[in-house]
Amino acid sequence: MKKSIICILLIFALVLSGCSSSDDEKDNTGTPATESVDTVDNETKQETNTPVKDDTDTGAQTTVADKKTGFSLSVSGSDKKLKISRAANAGKSMGDDGVWTIFVYLCGTDLESSGQGSATSDVAQMLESEGSDNVRFVIQTGGTSEWENEMFTVGKAERYVVQNGDINLVDSVELTNMGDAETLASFLKWGVSNYASEKMGLVFWDHGGGSITGVCVDELFNCDTLYLSEINSALSSVFSDMTDKFEFIGFDCCLMGTAETANVLTTYARYMYGSQETEPGSGWNYTAISDYLVSNPSANGAELGKVVADSFYDECKECEQENECTLTIVDLSKFDEFLVEFNDYASRLYEACQNSDALGAIVRCIDKAENFGGNNKSEGYTNMVDIGGIVNACADYADPGNVLTALKGCISYNKNGSNHKKASGLSIYYPLQVQGSNELKVFSGIAISPYYISIADMVANGYTDNGYSNEVFFTDDGDWSNDDCENDYFDDDYFDYADEEEYGGESSLITFEEEPYVDENGMYCFKLDENGLDWAVSVSAEIALDYDGETFVILGETADVNGDWETGEFYDNFDGYWYSLPDGTLLSAYVVDYSEDGERAIYTSPVVVNGESTNLRFWVGGSGDIHIEGTWDGIDENGMAAREIKKLQDGDVIVPVYYLEDDSEFEGSEYEWEEGDELTYSYLPEGDYYYSFYVDDAYGDYYSSDYVVFSIDENGEIIFSGDGSMGLDGDYAYGDYGYDDYDYDDYDDEEYYY
């Protein structure tokens, strides 16, 4: 069944001439792991998994026959300690010494059908590597409506072996859903039966969305994806046919370097490879991987992992996208020690959160931790937050204990770009902005601690002085088990409150000693009272303009707000500067992240480029220098992160997009990008503008102040007019601004300069 590879190599040569990616640099080598405590009861435990996926949330309804799980987590109410039980096998090699087989679950999706050819390029890299009888890639194809090569067939699930610079079609089966556990299980059962070796790896190749939405979007089956629970079920079913673990399981996709993922894989593999941040379309360097194994057939997962991470970083750097790069190699033999320590830590943090006076401050601390995959209005939310960042940020409220030591101990190696210098190596779900009840249901089934579930529930549900109880997650005896959460031990409707949340800019938790006003020095300012300080987590400002007397256009967000979190006093620090295209066309800009030292701020701007909606990413250095990263499509409706950050090209037509008062969109004037163009940061044009404070509360709602009018004159001076009241209620940040009812004569004549 061998096919000629001449044509496919020609296609490969074409796609390899392109380069696409998404990220940054910094070599951050993890410390050696310490010896783990004996927390594992090596007995097989197989139970039913999480509920079937609902098509309203995932795009398809999937049933997985004979669902299984290879581990159990439990906490006793008597001591609150986490106990772990994992399935085990004989630990006996399944093939000849010095032979490596890497199984690749190649779900092409739009990374192929859009003409990008990313999967095709990676298979080309496998073919270009040094030949050896001791290294082979075994591939299953699917998930895309079109391949960028003439070898793979769209209407079939095909299985190929790449070895010694050749590719052979060895099996072709009925096309099935790559987002279904049964498809993965079938491939792996067939694979380990026919291509077992001393060391075996598994790579998930496609889009990823983090712990909640999982990996591998099958665009032929309603964009269904593999949840972590389904990966667990598939791996458990094949594990019973194996006498040894996979040497590694890795994700050549975005955002899967998470604690929830590592917990699932610990039963089945020795190492996990995953990125906390988004990955570029070019992904891993399979030539480097294969060449290393050809020369080092006895290498273990840690040694290979370092090569994977370093060569991945180099791939990103070649395309000038190394800044966002992250890749972590986790020693899963040490991971259970981390789980035990994390549960202890989560218990302490949960106790601290029950003090309503401290909860707002804790959430404010977590807000400052690094997060990954957008997490803003323009790009969407993944709710993936750095574990080390959470622990360090909350150190004043909960003793870290040994959790950071255990975390470092299980990180064999990681490679971080300059935008993620402090990333600890693993993320965890945290409800920065909940997208609905299904998100919380999925999380409860994969969570690694009942106390951490309780914290997430407390934040998502808006706990205040009315009291909070986490009894719903425990039995009458005070015990907890992940089996109970997976099997809907508690009411399946419990999280429905997340579908009823409405955020309208009138948070009752944000209260003032002095409400926003313009003071005698021309500063727009306010002072929170004690209650407001307890619940406020961040303060920013929104800038808007009246486009044509009828259209109220929001320019975006600025973090230029001065404040004191001890006294509750805040005042504007807006200097009148804004970002624009080279011809002066203003961009709508929103803050993605900024460094604590003020040396770097990352922004995103919604735009249309060549007719396609996307986001323009750029960062600003401490001296005001602007660096364009490129365009990124953000998080799609399936919760998957786009893999590419595309560089702007000469001739690209850019149209800025702005949000209006009702959250609809308004397009500005188009601009044709020329090579050598740069964004500008200069005074806003002479005219009238509007300024409003945004104060976020601990639960995702916010308070928006009345807009005040400020003018910029021909000299660039900022003038606030009136007493700070436009006569617009805070509701109108996302409502009807009532221009017809507005009378400019209502303002006092006094003007303020600064």
Residue spans of the language-model regions?
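C-terminal motif of bacterial Sec signal peptides marking the signal peptidase cleavage site
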Residues: L16-G18
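Bacterial signal peptide processing site
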Residues: S20-D23
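N-terminal, intrinsically disordered, polar/charged segments of Gram-positive cell-envelope systems
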Residues: K26-T63
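Terminal, contiguous helix-loop blocks that mediate binding/assembly
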Residues: D54-G95, G210-S211, V215-F251, M256-Y744, ...
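N-terminal extension/subdomain marker
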Residues: G59-A196
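Structural recognition of the beta-strand scaffold that forms the well-ordered cores
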Residues: T101-L106, R136-T141, M200-F204, E247-F251, ...
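Catalytic-core segments of thiol-dependent peptidases
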Residues: T141-T243, C253-C254, A259, Q276-E277
